[in-house]
Amino acid sequence: MRCEIAFGVDANYVKYAGIVMTSAVLQNAGEAIGFHLVCDGITEADCDRLEDFRRIFPSADIHIYDARARLDEIPFPKGIPRERINRSVFTRILMPEMVPQELTRILYLDADTLCVGQLSEMYAYDLGSAPLAAAREGDAARKAQRIGMRGTDYFNAGVMLIDL
């Protein structure tokens, strides 16, 4: 099963996604990997570097999706100062509609992660009827309370296995 990895980035973070992509390819040598970058504006130079990556690592397939128009339609949450959150975090909720419809699963990774091993076992994990798998935050109750969330089902959204 080919691993499909998705990122939500803007021009400030696309270079870091490139580092994650490199770690994924090197740790999974010989495996075909699809990379899906849902972007809030990246430069032509960024696109050129991604094309260079594709030439260096021919087992990697790269798809770039411009999410700016869709992000413009999402109302910014009340009570959260704009300087505290980058709107590219909302690309996660757009991914199911932006990636190709034939994809049934993606592994979402934040641009500040690294791949330190094989992805196949994690990617093949049986989610049962759950829509996604993610790690619980260690201090979930405190974080949930801080943002005014009811309950304590707070998870780390930086690494998510998502069934589409």
Predicted features and spans:
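Glycosyltransferase catalytic domains, chiefly GT-A lineage
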Residues: M1-L164
